[in-house]
């Protein structure tokens, strides 16, 4: 995929040669100078693949930008002067577009020092745009700051690409939700029960948010949604061509997300429910 090529550029290789006659080793720099150099390199990051998740005003002319980066996880960056009319950052810090970001600092909010648009990704529109905002809100809610998750970053890129190409939103969102929960520490094995038995297509099950798949015949809370084994197996294979799987997977994921968020509502989820019942 062109986008992945742009977002996974490799580091330059550095080679060194040697003269026939050995040269004396250069003197070591003073201790103080070495420590200062280490601090500078540790607190600067250059051209990191990233996406803007959300931004909001900061003081009169700046923005706080919530970003998802490939190798550093989710970060907050202050974009100084980004609200000024002629700021070069105004047209670059857009959601759903691949960027290369540079920043410095070690505090909770770093300072953005550079932003470059990578390109190669179609813009989102219509339902795809709403789904993109929904994915962004989930990332903000579930991803702790400074917790690198390259597989989740890569699946986010895939999600945006699929939405931009008009793939069915239901399938794209369920796939993203599952990867998000898995990569943020919530077990999502759907083909085996907590008793280590294989899920059977014709049986009825529930998903215990703390443990996993259980038989629906067990003594379980009445508000847990009951789902068929076929739905669980379809979800495990990312297969949503059955109408029953579409309906039951939506109910299950809504239940799990609400549980893991402690009942905190998702603004974009309600919009999607109202408009498209996604």
Swiss-Prot record:
Coiled-coil portions: none
Protein name in UniProt: DNA repair protein RecO
Keywords recorded for this protein, A-Z: DNA damage, DNA recombination, DNA repair
A single GO BP: DNA recombination
Biased composition, class Polar residues, residue ranges: 1-12
Function: Involved in DNA repair and RecF pathway recombination.
UniProt region (Disordered), positions on chain: 1-41
GO cellular component: bacterial nucleoid
Family: Belongs to the RecO family.
